[in-house]
A protein has these predicted regions:
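Conserved small/polar residues in nucleotide/adenosyl-binding loops
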Residues: 180-185
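Short Gly/Thr/Asp-enriched flexible loops that form oxyanion-binding sites at enzyme active sites
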Residues: 42-64, 133, 179
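Short, glycine-/small-residue-rich phosphate/pyrophosphate-handling segment
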Residues: 73-105
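Glycine-rich phosphate/diphosphate-binding loop of Rossmann-like nucleotide-binding domains
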Residues: 93-155
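Oxyanion-binding "anion nests"
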Residues: 138-178
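Phosphate/nucleotide-donor binding subsite
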Residues: 1-37
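Short, acidic/small-residue loops that bind anionic groups at enzyme active sites
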Residues: 52-84, 144-153
Length: 185
């Protein structure tokens, strides 16, 4: 679709989404909201994409924050889902726990994994490791009956395929992992 405006990477996401109504991101979300398309992706402003996902398309009831995820191959030939990879650089523990639910549902529906193993990316496998955010997320996730929580994983387990099928982290850590591995590939 041809548009005459662009939401630049340096634009304030919410203001740009409201003001640049003939940008591809706003037009795309408009089509999505009207049911003219089934999905929408953009290589443009991540912030504007988040604004669009929260304003133009009604989020699933109960979802606190949307996420960006990526599916990566594992050394065992399987797949691993990593989320968040850049949308929310700071996440409350409740959001990380919710990503466990979202990731588990996605892994079942889209990757065909029957009982996906969900883990928190952390600096150690032990329950007591990590910052306050990771420890609090761990506590919430281990109590959840909505997914198969297997604990913490370290970066060395990201692509092993042996520990987890879904790995949850904040967008700062996830984006760092994503960019590091894409550069290494």
């Amino acid at each position: 679709v041809h548009t005459t405006e662009v939401i630049e990477m340096g634009d304030h996401p919410a203001k740009a989404f409201q003001q640049k109504t003939n940008s591809s991101i706003v037009v795309g979300f408009g089509y999505l909201a009207k049911g003219l398309i089934n999905g929408f992706a953009s290589a443009g402003s991540t912030g504007a994409m988040m604004v669009g996902s929260m304003q133009a398309v009604k989020p699933i009831e109960g979802v606190i924050r949307p996420t960006i995820s990526t599916v990566a191959p594992t050394v065992t030939g399987g797949k691993v889902l990593l989320l968040d990879v850049g949308l929310n650089v700071d996440c409350k523990p409740e959001v990380l726990a919710q990503y466990g639910i979202i990731g588990s549902i996605y892994a079942q529906a889209m990757l065909g994994i029957r009982n996906p193993r969900v883990a928190v990316l952390n600096i150690g496998e032990e329950e007591t490791k990590g910052n306050a955010q990771s420890k609090a997320a761990y506590e919430l996730m281990k109590e959840s009956e909505e997914f198969n929580f297997v604990g913490n994983v370290e970066g060395s387990h990201l692509f092993s395929g042996q520990v987890a099928d879904v790995i949850v982290c904040d967008g700062f850590v996830g984006n760092t992992c994503l960019l590091y591995t894409s550069d290494a590939a």
